[in-house]
């Protein structure tokens, strides 16, 4: 029997700031190796017989998801966009309704996974999923409980009930994150598992329970999926209908109340990577228990996590620190209190700082750009345009633009003229001039853009055409 993976890639995780940002949360980060957490989540399904995954994400993350799926050859009209976040119960309902509408298998088994978890033992993971298959196929709602390795206060727990099969238990209760003494009691009892947030069930089984236990969520999601607007690789649901949907987790809405919940124990080196200290826990370390990533020199240091994006970092005689450098921010924290990084993010939000929101590298449907420098009346960006992509025709009243081609060839439209600009050549776009840029080549086009003028705001972009095949929201995101 095959599975339909449902990957939940929503959320705006702030716990790994400054690497994670609101527009680039942790599920899109590469914490180990070259692949992101999202990509690794999909890759670990290779040993299971699965259909192409369905990914559910926030609308603002759609370009990131599409690009990361394309990189691993998994982009196939399979991204459901949530216009607003409504937690996991509605998100899974959207996937279940879509699965029943579109699947060749009339009632597929949904393997629901978070995009931002790490699983180190993929063989054990696969074995647990296979073990859960028979229960899910027969109408049970299976959740995977992580066998705890220590007393942990950072996770919710699942208490197992009666044994219903070989290493499969009825769910007795879900419990909130405990204090350290209670967590110790849970660990000693052997009857409690960490709540992984991973599930396996038939699409119809989940929807039937949701309809019975949370009818408002069921009805709102049913209506939202009833007005789907396909948009290339994206599935856009009805925004107004989904806005009326209550926000609730699958645990609260369904799993805590259903009579059909089953927990399957799993020991697979699982982590939700909920903090820098937990990332240090699962990372490969040197002989002094340091995790060093980037251009780093460490002398007489131990138990540190040090990450450099583009600077040389030297450390002498320090221990138990998290040091993370990006192009626009530096974090220095004690590993024992690094969870307070959320206070930094709150500070940045209160002061309307860009550092909580996005990196200097920003992805767009046509490619990406990096902000190199900015100041009064100027902005400098390095722009990469993918082969065959373009900026739609537009103009600006208050700024001029200089384009300098570094590699590739640009087809430029300026007013009534259309001409080619090659490597080491440049062109100038005056204010109040209709212009467009296209990469007609087979390789990426890379250029430097210098904006100059009295006003550089986003509302001084007047677009004169809609990008073919894309919604208006896409054309509103050149900058």
What residue spans do the PLM features occupy?
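Left-handed beta-helix
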Residues: 2, 204-404, 409-428, 435, ...
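Conserved N-terminal catalytic core of the sugar/cofactor nucleotidyltransferase
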Residues: 2-7, 14-22, 30-114, 120-124, ...
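Short beta-strand segments
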Residues: 7-9, 56, 111-114, 143-147, ...
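Residue-level signal for inorganic ion chemistry
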Residues: 28, 38, 95, 116, ...
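A residue-level structural signature of the nucleotidyltransferase/glycosyltransferase Rossmann-like core
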Residues: 110, 191, 198-199, 271, ...
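A short, conserved beta-strand element in the Rossmann-like catalytic core
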Residues: 118-119, 427
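Conserved core of the sugar-phosphate nucleotidyltransferase
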Residues: 121-242, 262
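Noncatalytic nucleic-acid binding interfaces
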Residues: 447
């Amino acid at each position: 029997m095959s599975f339909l993976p449902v990957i939940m890639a929503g959320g705006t995780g702030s716990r790994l700031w400054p690497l994670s940002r609101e527009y680039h949360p942790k599920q899109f980060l590469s914490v180990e190796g070259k692949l992101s957490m999202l990509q690794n989540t999909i890759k670990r399904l290779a040993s299971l017989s699965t259909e192409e995954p369905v990914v559910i994400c926030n609308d603002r993350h759609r370009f990131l998801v599409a690009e990361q799926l394309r990189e691993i050859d998994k982009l196939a009209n399979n991204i459901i966009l949530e216009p607003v976040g409504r937690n996991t119960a509605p998100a899974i309902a959207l996937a279940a309704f879509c699965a029943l509408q579109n699947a060749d298998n009339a009632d597929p088994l949904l393997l629901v996974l978070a995009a931002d978890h790490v699983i180190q033992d993929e063989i054990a993971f696969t074995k647990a999923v296979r073990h859960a298959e028979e229960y899910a196929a027969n109408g049970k709602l299976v959740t995977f409980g992580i066998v705890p390795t220590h007393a942990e206060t950072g996770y919710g727990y699942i208490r197992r009930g009666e044994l219903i099969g070989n290493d499969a238990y009825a769910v007795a209760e879900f419990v909130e994150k405990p204090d350290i003494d209670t967590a110790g009691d849970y660990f000693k009892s052997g009857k409690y598992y960490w709540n992984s947030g991973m599930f396996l069930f038939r699409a119809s089984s989940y929807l039937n329970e949701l309809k019975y236990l949370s009818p408002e969520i069921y009805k709102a999601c049913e209506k939202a999926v009833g007005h789907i607007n396909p948009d290339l690789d994206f599935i856009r649901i009805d925004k107004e209908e989904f806005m009326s949907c209550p926000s609730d987790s699958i645990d609260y809405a369904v799993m805590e109340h259903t009579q059909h919940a089953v927990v399957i124990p799993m020991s697979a080196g699982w982590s939700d990577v909920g903090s820098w200290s937990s990332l240090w826990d699962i990372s490969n370390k040197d002989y002094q228990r340091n995790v060093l990533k980037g251009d780093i020199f460490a002398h007489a240091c131990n138990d540190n996590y040090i990450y450099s994006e583009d600077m040389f970092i030297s450390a002498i005689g320090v221990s138990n620190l998290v040091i993370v450098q990006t192009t626009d921010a530096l974090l220095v924290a004690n590993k024992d209190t690094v969870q307070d990084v959320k206070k930094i993010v709150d500070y940045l939000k209160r002061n309307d700082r860009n550092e909580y929101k996005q990196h200097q590298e920003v992805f767009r449907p046509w490619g990406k750009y990096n902000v190199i420098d900015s100041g009064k009346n100027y902005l400098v960006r390095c722009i990469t345009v993918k082969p065959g992509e373009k900026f739609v025709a537009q103009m600006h009243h208050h700024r001029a633009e200089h384009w300098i081609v570094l590699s590739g060839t640009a087809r430029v439209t300026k007013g009534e003229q259309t001409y080619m600009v090659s490597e080491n050549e440049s062109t100038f776009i005056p204010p109040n001039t209709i212009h467009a840029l296209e990469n007609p080549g087979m390789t990426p086009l890379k250029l430097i853009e210098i904006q100059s003028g009295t006003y550089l705001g986003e509302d001084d972009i007047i677009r004169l055409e809609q990008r073919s095949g894309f919604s208006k929201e896409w054309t509103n995101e050149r900058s």
